[in-house]
Amino acid sequence: EVAARFPTQIDGFRALVAAVRSFDDVSLDAPALSAREGVRRHVNDPLLEDMLFCPLMYYGSATERDMDFGQFVIMFKALFLEGFARPLEGVRVILRTLLAKYRAAGGERRMKCGVRRIEARGGRVAALILDDGTEVTARQVISSIGAPETERLITGDVPNGQGTTPAGNLSFVETISVLNREPAELGWGGDTIVFFNDSERFDYSRPQEDVDTRSGVICIPNNFEYGAGRRLPEGLVRVTCLARHDRWTAMPEE
Protein backbone atom coordinates (compact mmCIF):
# COMPACT_ATOMS: atom_id res chain seq x y z
CA GLU A 1 0.00 0.00 0.00
CA VAL A 2 2.87 2.38 0.73
CA ALA A 3 4.35 1.67 -2.70
CA ALA A 4 0.98 2.32 -4.38
CA ARG A 5 0.08 5.51 -2.51
CA PHE A 6 3.56 6.92 -1.86
CA PRO A 7 5.70 5.67 -4.75
CA THR A 8 8.43 8.24 -4.15
CA GLN A 9 8.74 7.16 -0.51
CA ILE A 10 8.90 3.39 -0.83
CA ASP A 11 12.69 3.12 -0.82
CA GLY A 12 12.93 5.28 2.28
CA PHE A 13 10.10 3.38 3.94
CA ARG A 14 11.83 0.07 3.32
CA ALA A 15 15.00 1.54 4.81
CA LEU A 16 12.97 2.61 7.86
CA VAL A 17 11.56 -0.91 8.25
CA ALA A 18 15.09 -2.30 8.05
CA ALA A 19 16.22 0.17 10.73
CA VAL A 20 13.29 -0.88 12.93
CA ARG A 21 14.05 -4.58 12.55
CA SER A 22 17.73 -4.10 13.44
CA PHE A 23 17.19 -1.75 16.40
CA ASP A 24 17.77 -3.22 19.88
CA ASP A 25 14.53 -2.15 21.54
CA VAL A 26 15.13 -4.09 24.77
CA SER A 27 18.42 -2.42 25.67
CA LEU A 28 18.20 -0.56 28.97
CA ASP A 29 21.25 1.53 28.08
CA ALA A 30 20.04 2.89 24.75
CA PRO A 31 20.24 6.70 24.53
CA ALA A 32 17.04 8.71 24.12
CA LEU A 33 16.40 9.41 20.44
CA SER A 34 13.64 11.43 18.79
CA ALA A 35 11.38 9.19 16.74
CA ARG A 36 10.48 12.13 14.51
CA GLU A 37 14.14 12.65 13.66
CA GLY A 38 14.66 8.93 13.12
CA VAL A 39 11.73 8.65 10.73
CA ARG A 40 12.68 11.79 8.79
CA ARG A 41 16.04 10.26 7.95
CA HIS A 42 14.13 7.90 5.68
CA VAL A 43 10.71 9.45 4.99
CA ASN A 44 10.19 13.06 3.90
CA ASP A 45 6.49 13.07 3.02
CA PRO A 46 4.57 14.76 5.90
CA LEU A 47 1.39 12.79 5.18
CA LEU A 48 3.13 9.42 5.35
CA GLU A 49 4.95 10.53 8.49
CA ASP A 50 1.65 11.47 10.16
CA MET A 51 0.04 8.21 9.05
CA LEU A 52 2.84 6.26 10.70
CA PHE A 53 2.78 8.25 13.93
CA CYS A 54 -1.00 8.46 14.49
CA PRO A 55 -1.47 4.79 15.49
CA LEU A 56 1.86 4.51 17.30
CA MET A 57 1.34 7.64 19.38
CA TYR A 58 -2.21 6.79 20.39
CA TYR A 59 -1.10 3.34 21.50
CA GLY A 60 2.34 4.12 22.88
CA SER A 61 3.34 7.74 23.50
CA ALA A 62 2.97 9.71 26.72
CA THR A 63 4.62 12.82 25.27
CA GLU A 64 3.26 15.44 22.92
CA ARG A 65 4.14 15.49 19.20
CA ASP A 66 7.02 13.00 19.47
CA MET A 67 8.10 9.77 21.12
CA ASP A 68 11.31 7.97 21.94
CA PHE A 69 12.63 6.01 18.97
CA GLY A 70 12.94 2.86 21.08
CA GLN A 71 9.24 3.06 21.95
CA PHE A 72 8.49 3.83 18.30
CA VAL A 73 10.27 0.61 17.31
CA ILE A 74 8.33 -1.46 19.85
CA MET A 75 5.00 -0.09 18.67
CA PHE A 76 5.92 -0.25 14.97
CA LYS A 77 6.74 -3.94 15.29
CA ALA A 78 3.58 -4.65 17.28
CA LEU A 79 1.14 -2.76 15.06
CA PHE A 80 2.59 -2.90 11.56
CA LEU A 81 4.75 -6.02 11.50
CA GLU A 82 2.81 -8.31 13.86
CA GLY A 83 -0.75 -6.96 13.65
CA PHE A 84 -3.71 -6.79 16.00
CA ALA A 85 -5.31 -9.61 17.95
CA ARG A 86 -7.72 -9.82 20.85
CA PRO A 87 -8.67 -12.77 23.08
CA LEU A 88 -12.41 -13.30 23.41
CA GLU A 89 -12.20 -12.46 27.12
CA GLY A 90 -10.02 -9.43 26.50
CA VAL A 91 -7.02 -8.48 28.59
CA ARG A 92 -8.15 -10.68 31.49
CA VAL A 93 -6.67 -13.74 29.76
CA ILE A 94 -3.28 -12.05 29.58
CA LEU A 95 -3.50 -10.86 33.19
CA ARG A 96 -4.31 -14.36 34.42
CA THR A 97 -1.28 -15.73 32.58
CA LEU A 98 1.00 -13.05 34.02
CA LEU A 99 -0.41 -13.62 37.51
CA ALA A 100 0.21 -17.36 37.26
CA LYS A 101 3.82 -16.70 36.24
CA TYR A 102 4.22 -14.22 39.09
CA ARG A 103 2.90 -16.66 41.67
CA ALA A 104 5.06 -19.47 40.27
CA ALA A 105 8.08 -17.23 40.86
CA GLY A 106 7.09 -16.81 44.52
CA GLY A 107 5.18 -13.55 44.21
CA GLU A 108 2.17 -12.63 46.35
CA ARG A 109 -0.69 -10.41 45.21
CA ARG A 110 -2.52 -8.29 47.76
CA MET A 111 -5.76 -6.60 46.79
CA LYS A 112 -7.72 -3.74 48.38
CA CYS A 113 -4.82 -2.48 50.49
CA GLY A 114 -3.86 1.05 49.50
CA VAL A 115 -0.45 2.58 50.13
CA ARG A 116 -0.51 5.38 52.70
CA ARG A 117 3.10 6.44 52.22
CA ILE A 118 6.47 5.35 50.85
CA GLU A 119 9.29 5.43 53.39
CA ALA A 120 12.72 6.57 52.18
CA ARG A 121 15.73 5.72 54.30
CA GLY A 122 19.34 6.45 53.47
CA GLY A 123 18.37 8.18 50.25
CA ARG A 124 16.35 5.31 48.78
CA VAL A 125 12.98 3.62 49.14
CA ALA A 126 12.93 1.10 51.97
CA ALA A 127 9.31 0.33 52.83
CA LEU A 128 5.65 0.84 52.02
CA ILE A 129 3.20 1.74 54.77
CA LEU A 130 -0.24 0.42 53.84
CA ASP A 131 -3.56 2.00 54.79
CA ASP A 132 -4.01 -0.49 57.64
CA GLY A 133 -0.56 0.38 59.07
CA THR A 134 1.21 -2.73 57.78
CA GLU A 135 4.82 -2.14 56.74
CA VAL A 136 6.13 -3.94 53.66
CA THR A 137 9.88 -3.73 53.11
CA ALA A 138 11.47 -4.00 49.70
CA ARG A 139 14.78 -3.37 47.96
CA GLN A 140 12.97 -2.08 44.88
CA VAL A 141 9.49 -0.61 44.40
CA ILE A 142 7.69 -0.22 41.08
CA SER A 143 4.84 2.29 41.13
CA SER A 144 2.19 2.58 38.42
CA ILE A 145 0.21 5.52 39.82
CA GLY A 146 2.28 8.18 38.03
CA ALA A 147 5.49 10.02 38.91
CA PRO A 148 3.94 13.09 40.65
CA GLU A 149 1.49 10.91 42.57
CA THR A 150 4.28 8.58 43.67
CA GLU A 151 6.49 11.46 44.81
CA ARG A 152 3.69 12.87 46.96
CA LEU A 153 3.66 9.63 48.96
CA ILE A 154 7.41 9.63 49.68
CA THR A 155 8.46 10.61 53.20
CA GLY A 156 11.71 10.41 55.14
CA ASP A 157 15.24 10.78 53.79
CA VAL A 158 14.56 12.15 50.31
CA PRO A 159 17.49 13.42 48.17
CA ASN A 160 17.42 17.07 47.08
CA GLY A 161 15.61 17.62 43.81
CA GLN A 162 13.22 14.73 44.31
CA GLY A 163 9.49 15.30 44.16
CA THR A 164 9.49 17.86 41.36
CA THR A 165 8.25 15.84 38.39
CA PRO A 166 5.41 17.75 36.68
CA ALA A 167 2.25 16.03 35.56
CA GLY A 168 2.11 15.14 31.88
CA ASN A 169 -0.03 17.07 29.42
CA LEU A 170 -1.77 14.18 27.70
CA SER A 171 -5.10 12.70 28.69
CA PHE A 172 -7.82 10.82 26.86
CA VAL A 173 -11.56 10.33 26.89
CA GLU A 174 -13.17 7.09 25.75
CA THR A 175 -16.78 6.35 24.96
CA ILE A 176 -18.10 2.79 24.85
CA SER A 177 -21.33 2.16 22.96
CA VAL A 178 -23.10 -1.09 23.87
CA LEU A 179 -25.36 -2.27 21.05
CA ASN A 180 -28.16 -4.84 20.87
CA ARG A 181 -26.83 -6.10 17.53
CA GLU A 182 -23.57 -6.82 15.78
CA PRO A 183 -21.82 -3.67 14.50
CA ALA A 184 -21.63 -5.41 11.11
CA GLU A 185 -25.43 -5.09 10.87
CA LEU A 186 -24.94 -1.32 10.95
CA GLY A 187 -22.33 -1.39 8.21
CA TRP A 188 -19.28 -1.57 10.50
CA GLY A 189 -18.20 -5.11 9.72
CA GLY A 190 -14.97 -4.56 7.82
CA ASP A 191 -12.66 -3.12 10.46
CA THR A 192 -11.38 -3.98 13.92
CA ILE A 193 -9.44 -0.79 14.66
CA VAL A 194 -9.45 2.50 12.74
CA PHE A 195 -7.06 5.37 13.48
CA PHE A 196 -8.38 8.62 12.04
CA ASN A 197 -7.19 12.19 11.55
CA ASP A 198 -9.05 14.82 9.53
CA SER A 199 -6.62 17.73 10.05
CA GLU A 200 -4.01 18.92 7.58
CA ARG A 201 -1.35 17.72 10.06
CA PHE A 202 -1.72 15.22 12.89
CA ASP A 203 -1.58 17.17 16.17
CA TYR A 204 -0.86 14.86 19.10
CA SER A 205 -0.99 17.40 21.94
CA ARG A 206 -3.20 18.61 24.76
CA PRO A 207 -6.32 20.14 23.21
CA GLN A 208 -7.62 23.59 24.01
CA GLU A 209 -11.18 22.30 24.33
CA ASP A 210 -12.64 19.46 26.41
CA VAL A 211 -12.09 16.92 23.63
CA ASP A 212 -10.18 17.00 20.35
CA THR A 213 -12.33 15.07 17.89
CA ARG A 214 -10.03 15.73 14.93
CA SER A 215 -8.19 12.47 15.55
CA GLY A 216 -8.64 9.30 17.54
CA VAL A 217 -9.16 5.56 17.58
CA ILE A 218 -12.30 3.56 16.77
CA CYS A 219 -12.22 -0.03 18.02
CA ILE A 220 -14.88 -2.63 17.17
CA PRO A 221 -14.04 -5.74 19.25
CA ASN A 222 -16.78 -7.84 17.60
CA ASN A 223 -14.89 -7.88 14.32
CA PHE A 224 -11.86 -9.78 15.61
CA GLU A 225 -11.57 -13.47 14.70
CA TYR A 226 -12.30 -15.50 17.86
CA GLY A 227 -12.76 -18.90 16.24
CA ALA A 228 -15.77 -20.81 14.96
CA GLY A 229 -18.90 -20.26 17.02
CA ARG A 230 -17.25 -17.79 19.42
CA ARG A 231 -18.57 -14.25 19.64
CA LEU A 232 -19.07 -11.43 22.09
CA PRO A 233 -22.49 -11.35 23.81
CA GLU A 234 -23.26 -7.79 22.66
CA GLY A 235 -22.08 -5.24 20.13
CA LEU A 236 -19.34 -2.86 21.24
CA VAL A 237 -17.87 0.28 19.67
CA ARG A 238 -15.13 2.19 21.50
CA VAL A 239 -13.96 5.66 20.48
CA THR A 240 -10.87 7.27 22.05
CA CYS A 241 -9.83 10.91 21.61
CA LEU A 242 -7.43 13.36 23.21
CA ALA A 243 -8.93 15.31 26.11
CA ARG A 244 -7.96 18.18 28.39
CA HIS A 245 -7.72 16.78 31.91
CA ASP A 246 -7.95 20.03 33.86
CA ARG A 247 -11.21 21.01 32.16
CA TRP A 248 -12.75 17.61 32.91
CA THR A 249 -11.73 17.62 36.57
CA ALA A 250 -13.21 21.11 36.98
CA MET A 251 -16.65 19.91 35.85
CA PRO A 252 -19.36 19.14 38.43
CA GLU A 253 -20.09 15.48 39.09
CA GLU A 254 -23.71 15.81 37.96
Task: Outline where the language-model segments fall.
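Mid-domain catalytic core of redox enzymes
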Residues: 116-231
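Redox-cofactor-proximal catalytic regions of oxidoreductases
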Residues: 1-18, 59-89, 230-239
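Glycine- and acidic
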Residues: 54, 78-86, 245-254
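Helical element adjacent to the flavin cofactor pocket in flavoenzyme catalytic cores
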Residues: 73-129
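General beta-strand structural signal in soluble alpha/beta enzymes
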Residues: 50-51, 111, 143
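Glycine-rich phosphate/pyrophosphate-binding beta-alpha loops
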Residues: 56-61, 172-174, 245
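Rossmann-like flavin
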Residues: 2-67
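FAD-dependent oxidoreductase catalytic-site/capping-region signature
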Residues: 223-254
